[in-house]
Amino acid sequence: PCKQGVSSVASLNHIAQQIYNPKSKKQYKIMKSGVVQWVLKVGDKVINKQNKYQIINSDGSVVDIFNGNLGIIKDIKDDYILIDFQGIGYVEVPKSHAPYIELGYAITCHSAQGSQFDTVIGGIDFSMFIMLNKELLYTMITRASKKFILCAQTKALQYAITKEQIIHRQTYLMDDLDELCNKKFDF
């Protein structure tokens, strides 16, 4: 799904949070221009959307987190959110970075690139018309290591299967590499 709209990541995350984590009392509201954008709760699956370097945990350890890191919120304190990030461990994310921590029950195909999940539920509809193509569908399917479920409008799926996004670009990369590789080096 795309970021905004009826069938968007934001909508799906809101619904998933209500189903999977409805009762968590500890929460932190992410505000923008005085309006609640989303609510983070203990137990939520989240995704970090911006690199943050040199986070100093209370035990003195220094940790970096990167765009696309997934985790689970373990606690919410006055000045930080404790998140258990996959492959990193527990990180005390300062609340100043909280606007870059989004719900991660549903993520965009772009955010999922480079990741693998046991089960992926992919969605295709005409709300993301401009993005519909074979490459998007391929990326979506190949994120699943065991099971892929597709929820699609039939016409949108037919359109995606017939449209290619790859643009053939004219570059001089091969010429430059050929020239570089054929140079003689004096040592």
Language-model regions, residue ranges each:
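Conserved helicase/translocase motor-coupling segment
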Residues: 1-67
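C-terminal accessory regions
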Residues: 59, 67-187
